[in-house]
Amino acid sequence: MRIIVLGSAAGGGHPQWNCHTLASLRAWQQTDGAQRRTQASIAVSADGERWVLINASPDFRQQILATPALWPQHGLRHSPIEAVLLTSGEIDHIAGLLSMRESQRFSLHASSRVLGLLAQNPIFDAVNPQYVSRQPFALDTPLVLCGLQLTPFSVPGKVPLFMESRSGGDLAGSDEETLGLTIDDGRRRMHYIPGCAAMTDALRARLQSAELVFFDGTLWRDDEMVQLGVSQKTGQRMGHMSIDGPDGTIAAFAPLNVARKIFIHLNTTNPVLDTLSPEFASARASGWEVAHDGLEIAL
C-alpha cells in the first residue's frame, strides 16, 4: 500500500490567509522549522496506478500539481484518481470537488448524511452526474475500491460549520457526521481519522496494536485559540481532541501500542507545526510524527 499526504493542515491551511499569530508568521516568512501546508487530504493506492482520494480539499489543484503520481498519464483526458471518499461534510473536505468538474469519470463515496448535504446545494451539480456516480456507504461495512478495502466507522465529532445554525442546538448530529477509515490492501492495514472529539472504548479497541494511524492533530491545547485571542472556540467546541493534557491524544494513545502515529489536520495556531518548537519536540518524544505535505509512506 502506498500513501501520499497531499495536505496536512486544518481548514484554511497553514498559514491561514488572515492569521498573524507567531506560528503563522513563521510560515509566512518560511523561517527555519516552519513549512507551509495545504488542507488535509491523502491519496492511497494498492498498485501505484489507481488511487483513492480521501477528502477533496479546497487546495486540490495545488496538491495535484505537487504530486506527479496523480498527474494525467495518457490520452487527452485522464486521472489516476478513480474514486473519492469523504469522511465528513466539512468545507475543507468537500470544496475540492468543485475543482473536479471537468467531466472526468470517478466514483464518489460518502455517508447518506454527507451525500444529502451535497444534494441540498446545487453548486455541486457542476460535478457532472453522468460521469461521477454518488454512492452511499454503510458504517462498519467494507467497500472495495481500486484493490483496497475501506471500512468507514463513526467517531465523536459534530455537524459541519455551515450546518450549525440548522442543527437545533444538537451540534453532535448523527453518527454519520464524522468518520474514520480503516484501509486494508490484503497485507497491511492503516487507519485515517482526521477529526475526532473524544477517545471512546470502541475506538480504543479498534486502534489497539495498529500498524499505522493518522489522527486529528488540530490543536495542541484545548483553549489554544482562546489564549491567543483569535477565537472564543475551544477544541471541544469545534469537535476536536487536543494533543496535550491529561485527556489529550498523546495520553489517550499511550497504552495502545500503535506502531506508527502521525498527527494530521493541524490548525494554523498549533505550535507543533514549528519543528524547532518545544511542543514539536514533546510530540516526537512521545512517539508521534507530524504530517507534512508530500509525506509518502509505503506499507
From Swiss-Prot:
It comes from the Bacteria. This is Coenzyme PQQ synthesis protein B. NCBIfam families: PQQ_syn_pqqB (TIGR02108). Pathway: Cofactor biosynthesis; pyrroloquinoline quinone biosynthesis. PANTHER family: COENZYME PQQ SYNTHESIS PROTEIN B, HYDROLASE C777.06C-RELATED-RELATED. GO terms for biological process: pyrroloquinoline quinone biosynthetic process. It comes from Xanthomonas euvesicatoria pv. vesicatoria (strain 85-10) (Xanthomonas campestris pv. vesicatoria). Coiled coil: none annotated. Belongs to the PqqB family. The gene is pqqB. HAMAP family: PQQ_syn_PqqB. May be involved in the transport of PQQ or its precursor to the periplasm. Keywords: PQQ biosynthesis, Transport.
